[in-house]
Amino acid sequence: MRIGILDEHPEWSRRLIAELEGRGLEVERIDHSEHGFDPRDRRPHWDVVVNRTSPSSHRRGHGRVLFYAEPLLAHLEALGVPVINSVTTWRFEKSKALQVGLFERLGVRYPRTVVVNGVGPLRRAARDVRFPALVKPNVGGSGALIERFETPAELQARAAELDFGPDGVALLQEYIEPRDGAIVRVEVLDGRMLYAIRIVRRSDQFNLCPADLCRVPASDALAACPVDAAPVLDITRHEPPQEAVEQAIALTRAASIDVGGVEYLVGAADGRTYVYDVNATSNFVADAPRVLGFDPFPAFADTIVRAAGRAARVAA
């Protein structure tokens, strides 16, 4: 069995690869920051490919990955290679606008949001959103480029200075103050909740990504890994209400996410639950045995092996 791990980050798949290799499996990390494929080559080179492409790749000088991943994944799927977190998954992963559209279609409560692609539309959208509000790039990644504005006047004054990210699309979103400063991430694997964690910020730094538990300092982008979350986060295992679990499973299913997380918060003002992010790049929580009481990587590896096994039986 030959397993491909599609990941441009040099560290994020290290634990997964170690788990798979520990089982005697052949694993290749596919660095698609410098890569190519021939559409005429119809040979499947892997029994299964795990797509771990992250929207934050552009923060590490790998912006081409954002656009290259889609045709590469489509090519692999056309060859019949099972892909965990498929090309459909990637489309949702890299677009917060698509995620918001999914929330709306499924009837999931989320912060009021308007999608824009220019300064003029952003300024006009300020009339339709309550403040404080956030401006988020459509292509996110580790909380980068998110700006908070207390008033419409403040936004109007700074709108022309904002960086909308690699595709020039941004979201203007009502800021919901989370109760106790906490958010919850529900991690889903193969259609079931694997675990949930409660994350509380201990820093005023806003460009923080509780999704993959990392920050991306401008001076050292490769430091963006879960291990570095400790100075700014309190992370504990959490048992979310069943409704939140079912909602997370429904969202991941609708986005074709085989492994990923759904993040929500409870509003401090109204006590209502708001979903605000779906993330398909699962690095899992740092020091999982201590925080969770178990290591999630064996379960992830089991899912990968099962996917390859199903494909082999179909081919036979």
Q: Model segments located where?
A:
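Short glycine-rich anion-binding loops that position phosphate/pyrophosphate groups of nucleotides
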Residues: 54-57, 138-140, 281
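A short glycine-rich, hydrophobically flanked beta-strand micro-motif that places a catalytic Asp/Glu
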Residues: 173-174, 184, 257-269
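Phosphate-binding site of ATP-dependent enzymes
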Residues: 147-252
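Conserved N-proximal alpha/beta basic substrate-recognition cap immediately N-terminal to
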Residues: 8-112
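Rossmann-like NAD(P)H-binding beta-loop-alpha module
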Residues: 105-131
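C-terminal active-site "lid" helix and adjoining low-complexity regulatory extension at the edge
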Residues: 239, 253-257, 266-316
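Extreme N-terminal starter segment of soluble prokaryotic enzymes
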Residues: 1-4
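Protein kinase-like catalytic core scaffold
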Residues: 133, 194-195, 260, 274-276
